[in-house]
Amino acid sequence: MPKVVSRSVVCSDTRDREEYDDGEKPLHVYYCLCGQMVLVLDCQIEKLPMRPRDKARVIDAAKHAHKFCNVEEDEAVYLKRSEGIERQYRKKCGKCGLLLFYQHQMKSTQTTFIVDGALVKFGQGFGNTSVYSQKQETPKKVRVMMTKRTKDMGKFSSVTVSTIDEEEEEIEAREVADSYAQNAKVIEKQLERKGMSKRRLQEPAELEAKKAKMKGTLIDNQFK
């Protein structure tokens, strides 16, 4: 009969509550000025190399994963430069027809140029006439709390993990409400103590007043 060996692993963690930030998203979505989604990129546009001639950002397919969305092929344009003729195969927005990208080759090209100022991220006020005058809204920080509970069952142990997503404003509001409730309780107790002390001082005075009224003779009471 084969020998059976059982092993038990003890899991212990001094910190059962840990906080995790959502961090930077791996993919970035960019939109046309009209609000149409046109590009999904694995990094920010600002991190891409810039072409000095027209300040266009360069996407190298060998280095960055990307995908074009809702984009149509536009006509080829020939531009006269000092060193020769530059040929551009342009791509426009499928909704409004705005020039967004261009390439130097029609097919099987690794390089795509993003036209300067043609794309915006979500929340930068796309769809308005003045995009760069709009104030960018800062995303709300979400606090993620993870609670780990370990249950010992002899040879085996089970770990239960639960997460709670809370917005920072909700957490601050709850903390303020708790502090107000605690202050109200303290004030209520102080008022109760003051009321009891006043009663204790008033009771002897009332007794003395009653005793003073009871003093006197029967003749005085008859002529009252």
Swiss-Prot record:
Residues 191-224 are annotated as: Disordered. One of its GO terms (biological process) is endoplasmic reticulum to Golgi vesicle-mediated transport. It comes from the Eukaryota. One of its GO terms (cellular component) is cytoplasm. Its main location: cytoplasm. Residues 172-194 form a coiled coil. The keyword Nucleus applies. GO terms for molecular function: protein-macromolecule adaptor activity. Keywords: Coiled coil, Cytoplasm, Nucleus. It is found in: Cytoplasm; Nucleus. Residues 191-211 have a biased composition (Basic and acidic residues). Molecular adapter that stimulates membrane curvature formation and subsequent endoplasmic reticulum exit site (ERES) establishment by recruiting PI3K complex I, leading to COPII vesicle-mediated transport. Promotes endoplasmic reticulum (ER) exit of cGAMP-activated STING1 oligomers. PANTHER family: STING ER EXIT PROTEIN, UPF0428 PROTEIN CXORF56. Belongs to the STEEP1 family. This is STING ER exit protein. It comes from Danio rerio (Zebrafish). The gene is steep1.
